[in-house]
Amino acid sequence: MSNEAANVQVLKEAYRRWNESHGGSVDYWFESVFGADISFGSLPRGVAPVEFARQYRDRVQLRQYFDGLLADWSMKYYTVDEYVAQGDMVVARGSCSWTFKKTGKVAETPKIDFWRFKDGKAVEFYEYFDTAAVFAATT
């Protein structure tokens, strides 16, 4: 299996677990996907009301992303329909739907995740999604 195919397989299993557990597989991501050093970023860049969706530079801080996400939001689904791999990079394209717990409103959005791997572990991540839909669900 090529490195590209192996990286895609790592993500397929992680996203499968993420969707099926409705966000309950955080430990799996840390054990099986994230490298010792990871740069993890998100399109909102920490803007309220999704302060947790910002840049993280290490695994200890990265727990704050998942803690914030799961404290405020409840996953309805998270699917990846397509993977594009080239060299050490993988792009995952799909969609997701989350309910903001304080308002009960749903944010449904296309989702693009960019990944870079080194030695079978993710060392870089950046996520893109419809921030207008997410912000609207919080009001």
Regions from the language model: what does each represent?
Residues 21-24, 60, 106:
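Residue-level recognition of alpha-helix initiation/capping sites
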Residues 28-87:
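A solvent-exposed, acidic/Ser-Thr-rich amphipathic alpha-helical stretch
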Residues 1-36, 139:
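Short, low-complexity N-terminal intrinsically disordered segments enriched in polar/charged residues
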Residues 1-15, 51-61, 108-109:
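Charged, low-complexity, helix/coiled-coil-prone segments
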Residues 11, 26-30, 38, 62, ...:
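Hydrophobic pocket/interface hotspot
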